[in-house]
Amino acid sequence: MKKTIWAVLIVLMSSTLAAHATELKVGEKAPNLSLKDSQGNVFTLDSPEFKGKVLSIFYINPDAIDLNRHVEDALIKDNELDRQTSYKSFNITNLKAGKLPNFVYKSAIKNKREKTGGVILLDYDNTVLNLWGLKNRSDVIVLDKERICRYIYNGKLPPAEVDKLIKVIKEYQVK
């Protein structure tokens, strides 16, 4: 009987540990993900829109949606980023972190998508948090063309970090 109890405890503990990945770090390959946009289209890191491009990913808590708007604006203004062939930026909204009902956020996301034409993916169940080991906050992540993490920052980026982010993107878009 004791062996059975120990076996059950070991299985439970190992499945709990497996459910929470270690936090993604610079230099590590990011596990692929599969998320939908507000239209129901499925995207992975290998989707045609992203394949072969350096990616800047804004993982957003919807209650702090404008936290890094200044970073998005700086990226849009930078004419040296090759958006046609080697660079793409997109948002992932962590709907589970929001305090309001999802329909409120989805409406705002739809308006932003129509205004900017950008890709905004929806994380309903902490998929990215669990897969990449992120915390429940806003993060900015840069993945190179091979999906190696080259930059990660948690929270609001100060001006020096915005410059560093852009420099990293430019460095890897030509490799």
Regions found by a protein language model. Name each.
Residues 7-16:
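Bacterial N-terminal signal peptides
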Residues 61-112:
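Structural microenvironment flanking redox-active thiols in thiol-disulfide oxidoreductases
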Residues 136-175:
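Thiol-/selenol-based redox modules, centered on thioredoxin-like
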Residues 45-69:
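Short active-site neighborhood of thiol/selenol oxidoreductases, capturing the structured segment around
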Residues 1-4:
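Positively charged n-region of N-terminal signal peptides that target proteins for export
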Residues 88-92, 103-136:
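Short, internal strand/loop/helix patches
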Residues 20-45, 66-69:
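N-terminal "domain-start" segment that seeds a small globular fold
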